[in-house]
Amino acid sequence: TIGHGAIIHARVIGPEASIGMGAVLSLCSEIGAGSIVAESALVPQGKIIPPETLVAGVPAKPLRELTDKDRTDWRETKDWYVRMAAQCLDPDNYHPVK
């Protein structure tokens, strides 16, 4: 998933990776599968983030490897966003502002 306001110039974003709101992925950076880039993080040009890693900061630095709890929590959050998007697209759910 990619949070709103993120700027993406990365060469690769691996499957199941999550990019936080306002994060910047500079030219030729690579984000490994399942990694999490924190909100407002700056991944420098050419930086390679290993799979299953949490990174944060300016410049982004690895904080730790992801835990099973991280993976479960992020999966649930992503699923929630998918449900909310589907709900917004449902014409029966449309309520015009009066």
Where in the sequence are the language-model features?
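C-terminal segments of enzyme domains that contribute to small-molecule binding surfaces
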Residues: 1-2, 6-7, 24, 52-98
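Structural signal for interior beta-strand "rungs" in well-ordered beta-sheet cores
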Residues: 1-55, 59-62
